[in-house]
């Protein structure tokens, strides 16, 4: 009866009061669930986390109250809570020690690097959790740019794309489910896709 009533309302007088009274469809939780346009639950979420090297380390993120960076060992416990809540995916953002940064950000593709070790640890501890990795050079460069720069400080697009491709491949080899480029280099999506397909 309810469904046919709604269909009749929509064909007889679309958008005209008093025939259309949306309050009718909002009066009980069950009716609201039937007509809801968008539903959002824990299974729709991706949990962003900041990981740092070391053991039993945490650091508060001053600009984001209540958010902290964690070492891998502590992060695994936090992710266990996320899994228990029904959150299906995690997005990793590394905090790289200064001594591992360089002009070209080559540490990003280290198979034993922070992100790569984190991906492996997560997949071992929580195999059903989807792992998304950030493909970007800014955490790894001494200058903080998201690309390899020349002597004049100009970002070299193609050289950067080559490094980002190496990074994405190393993440995939470590077990990442999704590699997510966040840089702004021209052509990097195609280059990464081609390299992943060829691997």
What are these model-derived regions, one by one?
Residues 1-8:
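Short, Lys/Arg-enriched N-terminal segments with co-localized hydrophobic residues
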Residues 10-57:
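N-terminal amphipathic alpha-helix/helix-capping segment at the start of soluble metabolic enzymes
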Residues 53-199:
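Alpha/beta enzyme core
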């Amino acid at each position: 009866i309810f469904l046919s009533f709604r269909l009749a309302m929509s064909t007889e007088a679309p958008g005209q009061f008093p025939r259309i009274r949306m309050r009718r469809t909002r009066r009980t939780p069950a009716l609201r669930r039937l007509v809801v346009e968008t539903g959002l639950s824990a299974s729709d979420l991706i949990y962003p986390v900041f990981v740092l090297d070391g053991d039993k380390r945490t650091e508060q993120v001053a600009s984001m109250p209540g958010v902290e960076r964690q070492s891998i060992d502590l992060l695994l416990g936090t992710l266990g809570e996320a899994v228990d809540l029904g959150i299906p995916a995690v997005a990793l953002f590394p905090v790289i020690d200064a001594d591992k940064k360089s002009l070209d950000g080559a540490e990003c593709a280290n198979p034993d690097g922070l992100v790569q070790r984190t991906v492996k640890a997560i997949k071992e501890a929580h195999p059903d959790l989807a792992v998304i990795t950030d493909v970007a050079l800014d955490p790894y460069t001494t200058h903080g740019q998201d690309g390899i720069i020349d002597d004049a400080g100009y970002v070299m697009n193609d050289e950067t794309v080559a490094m980002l491709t190496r990074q994405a491949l190393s993440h995939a080899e470590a077990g990442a489910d999704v590699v997510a480029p966040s840089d702004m280099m021209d052509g990097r999506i195609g280059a990464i896709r081609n390299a992943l397909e060829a691997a």
